């Protein structure tokens, strides 16, 4: 997702989305380590989305 899409979301929605992405990242890392993951680029995309959400949450606090 784009940062502007995340900025339109409420804080509670952002936290929920971050939790979902963190769980998905965990599952993908597990698949990577067991050799079942085919699309390794998805790992980086999810990590970047989590970072975007964390940045937006930090901006809203300040």
Curated annotation (Swiss-Prot):
The keyword Transport does not apply. Keywords: Ribonucleoprotein, Ribosomal protein. It comes from Trichlorobacter lovleyi (strain ATCC BAA-1151 / DSM 17278 / SZ). GO terms for biological process: translation. GO terms for molecular function: structural constituent of ribosome. Belongs to the universal ribosomal protein uL29 family. This is Large ribosomal subunit protein uL29. Coiled coil: none annotated. SUPFAM superfamilies: Ribosomal protein L29 (L29p) (SSF46561). PANTHER family: 60S RIBOSOMAL PROTEIN L35/50S RIBOSOMAL PROTEIN L29 (PTHR10916), LARGE RIBOSOMAL SUBUNIT PROTEIN UL29C (PTHR10916:SF0). Disulfide bonds: none annotated. InterPro entries: Ribosomal_protein_uL29, Ribosomal_uL29, Ribosomal_uL29_CS, Ribosomal_uL29_sf. NCBIfam families: L29. GO terms for cellular component: cytosolic large ribosomal subunit. Pfam families: Ribosomal_L29.
